[in-house]
Amino acid sequence: DLLQFXDMMK
């Protein structure tokens, strides 16, 4: 999920 990706980037 995109949300997961964004979380990782954070």
UniProtKB/Swiss-Prot annotation:
Location within or outside the cell = Secreted
Q: Which GO terms describe its molecular function?
A: metal ion binding; phospholipase A2 activity; toxin activity
An example of a Gene Ontology cellular component annotation for this protein is:
extracellular region
Does the entry feature the keyword Metal-binding, yes or no?
A: yes
Write the Enzyme Commission number(s) for this entry.
3.1.1.4
Q: Please state the protein's primary subcellular location.
A: secreted
Entry comment describing in which tissues the protein is expressed: Expressed by the venom gland.
Query: What does this protein need as cofactor?
Result: Ca(2+)
- Gene Ontology BP annotations: defense response to bacterium; killing of cells of another organism
Cofactor binding notes: Binds 1 Ca(2+) ion.
Q: Which UniProt keywords apply?
A: Antibiotic, Antimicrobial, Calcium, Cytolysis, Hemolysis, Hemostasis impairing toxin, Hydrolase, Metal-binding, Platelet aggregation inhibiting toxin, Secreted, Toxin
Enumerate the catalysed reactions.
a 1,2-diacyl-sn-glycero-3-phosphocholine + H2O = a 1-acyl-sn-glycero-3-phosphocholine + a fatty acid + H(+)
Secreted as a keyword?
A: yes
Protein origin, superkingdom: Eukaryota
- Write out the function statement from the record: Snake venom phospholipase A2 (PLA2) that has antibacterial activity against S.aureus ATCC 25923 and ATCC 29213, acts by inducing bacterial membrane breakage. Displays a potent inhibitory effect on collagen-induced human platelet aggregation and has indirect hemolytic activity. Does not show cytotoxicity to murine skeletal muscle myoblasts. PLA2 catalyzes the calcium-dependent hydrolysis of the 2-acyl groups in 3-sn-phosphoglycerides.
- Annotated family: Belongs to the phospholipase A2 family. Group II subfamily.
Additional notes on this entry: The determined pI of this protein is: 4.6.
Q: What is this protein called?
A: Acidic phospholipase A2 PnPLA2
Taxonomic lineage is: Eukaryota, Metazoa, Chordata, Craniata, Vertebrata
